Swiss-Prot record:
Binding site residues for substrate: 40-41, 97-105, 130
Oligomeric and partner information: Homodimer and homohexamer; in equilibrium.
Keywords from the named record: Glycosyltransferase, RNA-binding, Transcription, Transcription regulation, Transcription termination, Transferase
The protein's name in its UniProt record: Bifunctional protein PyrR
Organism: Streptococcus pyogenes serotype M3 (strain ATCC BAA-595 / MGAS315)
Lineage, uppermost ranks: Bacteria, Bacillati, Bacillota, Bacilli, Lactobacillales
UniProt function note: Regulates transcriptional attenuation of the pyrimidine nucleotide (pyr) operon by binding in a uridine-dependent manner to specific sites on pyr mRNA. This disrupts an antiterminator hairpin in the RNA and favors formation of a downstream transcription terminator, leading to a reduced expression of downstream genes. Also displays a weak uracil phosphoribosyltransferase activity which is not physiologically significant.
Molecular function, one GO term: RNA binding
Enzyme class: transferase
Motif extent (PRPP-binding): 93-105
An annotated GO BP: DNA-templated transcription termination
Length: 173
């Protein structure tokens, strides 16, 4: 098994900053935006984007934490630990996750969102898009496009959970 670091902490910070600038440019009414991080690492990325938006625009956007486990199509979990402090009805919700792969996580996140309210618009921001979709889903904001083979794995580490910021690719062969 081979592991290769493909994004270091500095590059990750730049990617998050780039996503933040794109959010500012594409959303004329930032005061109508709600950030929704997908647990676990998507929540920490959402907090970093929220912090950058505050630094750049002086805005304190609301942020929620989406638990997709109860909405997945491959397992059943009863407890939903979603935290959404604001009504998302009529809001522009930006889903935030670490890796976009098959699209199934995002489908589950959208199912969770519509159970909470009826957003005006839903867009998607991801740190890494690795391809290999099984569903017709694409990201609106992408930090890094990293094409992979189907046997490779992308591992995102964030300092809040893993003690460091980096993205690695693991080749099991």
């Amino acid at each position: 098994m081979k592991t290769k670091e493909i994004v270091d902490d500095v590059t990750m910070k730049r990617a998050i900053t780039r996503i933040t600038y794109e959010i500012i440019e594409r959303n004329k009414q930032l005061d109508n935006v709600v950030l929704a991080g997908i647990k676990t690492r998507g929540v920490f990325l959402a907090r970093r984007i929220q912090e950058r938006l505050h630094q750049l625009e002086g805005l304190d956007l609301p942020i929620g934490e989406l638990d997709i486990k109860p909405f997945r199509d491959d397992m059943r979990v009863e407890e939903d630990t979603t935290l959404m402090s604001v009504d998302i009805t009529g809001k522009d919700v930006i889903l935030i996750d670490d890796v976009l792969y098959t699209g199934r996580t995002i489908r589950a996140a959208i199912d969770n969102l519509v159970s909470l309210g009826r957003p005006a618009r839903v867009s998607l921001a991801v740190l890494v898009d690795r391809g290999h979709r099984e569903l017709p889903i694409r990201a609106d904001y992408v930090g890094k496009n990293i094409p992979t083979s189907s046997v490779e794995e992308i591992v995102v580490e964030v300092v809040e959970v893993d003690g460091r910021d980096r993205v690695s690719i693991i080749d099991p062969t």
